[in-house]
């Protein structure tokens, strides 16, 4: 979809490489886009690593690079885009978070901020994430707020004129 992680990464790659890629919407989302790459219907694709991980394990694709600041812990042989000379950071990385409605008492927000990271440290949760090729990057509330402030600057520049 427009302005989701895949699109942001593609825009960053275009800008860094000085190229223009064709944007081909897919009604089936990331899984449909991955199928198009595997079938040779498109020359390449920008997908979530969790989708690409499974296709790579099956031997149907080669992952050329990751749009992140560091290599993926489960695919350490795949370089980052920056390592390959492309100015592509982690602005497209899809993070998951816990949200509450506006007006939620601060005591509840503080309790969630204190306890949620431990939930993700659970071995069962970590194992499921690893099986899907998604290493966890557990962040505090303050780290998330700082990350979004930095991303806002990057995205405003990247999306200007679209």
Label the model's feature ranges.
Residues 1-162:
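Conserved, function-defining micro-sites of small-solute handling proteins
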């Amino acid at each position: 979809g427009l302005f989701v992680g895949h699109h942001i990464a593609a825009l960053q790659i275009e800008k860094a490489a000085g190229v223009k890629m064709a944007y081909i919407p897919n009604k089936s989302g990331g899984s449909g886009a991955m199928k198009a790459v595997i079938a040779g219907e498109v020359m390449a694709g920008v997908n979530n690593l969790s989708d690409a991980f499974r296709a790579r394990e099956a031997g149907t694709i080669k992952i050329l690079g990751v749009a992140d600041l560091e290599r993926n812990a489960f695919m350490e042989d795949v370089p980052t885009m920056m390592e390959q000379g492309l100015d592509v950071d982690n602005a497209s990385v899809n993070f998951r978070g816990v949200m509450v409605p506006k007006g939620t008492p601060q005591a509840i927000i503080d309790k969630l901020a204190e306890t949620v990271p431990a939930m993700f440290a659970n071995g069962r949760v970590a194992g499921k994430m690893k099986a899907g090729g998604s290493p966890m990057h557990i962040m505090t509330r303050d780290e998330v707020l700082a990350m979004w402030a930095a991303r806002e600057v990057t995205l405003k520049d990247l999306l200007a004129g679209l």
